[in-house]
């Protein structure tokens, strides 16, 4: 068992012109609880006439969760969902055995300058849900539970912890919380979830007395209560959950415990044997 925090520095990526930082997956750590993929969409100002347009693409064996601090995204999928997701909302999509979706800037925002900033993560589905049906749900900011005590605000995005429980229909024990801390406040991170991590979005923080650089992901040692101290105003997320029920392979947009499922998904997407998003023609082809 690791007794020291594991520090992961993210790599910089670009998704359709949106700069991101991606600490998971990494060579040091493939997952934290059910979390197998973590993208921080950096705060980006789009000028008039510019925006995101991620064409339809497939997924299996995972749930995606989009959570924005600023901006909006329109979500459309092969189940027929069509939803504008605003700041503070949760967009939750479970892929099951096959789903396709589109993510783009809503039309009204193309006529003005706007700012995008948020997180998109993937959670691997438990083995008994990998081949299940797809599902989509939208949860407005007002439905997410919040605690505000002694200068520390916690919003439970998904799962449970800190005496809060989100309405998002997670498939395994999960912790995913947004934390805002005023200067000189402290947050105790309990041990109720076996695997936990902290990602500092902004601000100067210490974990058990050790400085955490902004944009570093810190995987916490199991079974040890940790103390997060804000040297300045801090914005962070705390996440984790129960360990995965076995290793997962990630290939492009596919996650599976069985490599055969990934091979079949690749074949079906290439052959056009995949559910499509109503009204959408353009798609992202399988990388060579």
Model region roles, listed by residue range:
Residues 1-288:
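Jelly-roll (double-stranded beta-helix
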């Amino acid at each position: 068992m690791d007794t020291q925090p594991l520090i992961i520095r993210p790599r910089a990526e670009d998704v359709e012109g949106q700069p991101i930082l991606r600490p998971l997956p990494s060579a040091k750590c493939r997952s934290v609880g059910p979390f197998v993929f973590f993208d921080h969409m950096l705060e980006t100002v789009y000028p008039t006439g510019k925006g995101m347009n991620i064409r339809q693409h497939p997924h299996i064996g995972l749930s995606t969760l989009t959570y924005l601090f600023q901006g909006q995204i329109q979500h459309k999928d092969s189940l027929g969902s069509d939803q504008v997701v605003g700041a503070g909302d949760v967009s939750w999509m479970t892929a099951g055995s096959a789903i396709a979706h589109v993510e783009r800037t809503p039309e009204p925002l193309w006529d003005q300058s706007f700012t995008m900033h948020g997180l998109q993560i993937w959670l691997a589905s438990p083995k008994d849900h990998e081949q299940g049906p797809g599902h989509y749900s939208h949860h407005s900011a007002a439905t997410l539970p919040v605690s505000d005590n002694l200068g520390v605000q916690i919003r439970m995005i998904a799962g449970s912890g800190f005496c809060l429980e989100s309405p998002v229909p997670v498939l395994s024990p999960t912790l995913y919380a947004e934390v805002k801390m005023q200067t000189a406040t402290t947050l105790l991170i309990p041990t109720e979830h076996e695997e936990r991590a902290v990602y500092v979005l902004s601000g100067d923080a210490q974990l058990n007395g050790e400085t955490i650089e902004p944009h570093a992901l810190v995987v916490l040692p199991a079974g040890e209560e940790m103390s997060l101290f804000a040297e300045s105003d801090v914005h962070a997320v705390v996440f984790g959950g129960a360990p995965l029920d076995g290793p997962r392979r990630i290939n492009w947009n596919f996650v599976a415990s069985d490599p055969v499922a990934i091979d079949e998904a690749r074949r079906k997407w290439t052959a056009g044997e995949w559910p499509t998003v109503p009204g959408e023609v353009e798609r992202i082809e399988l990388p060579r």
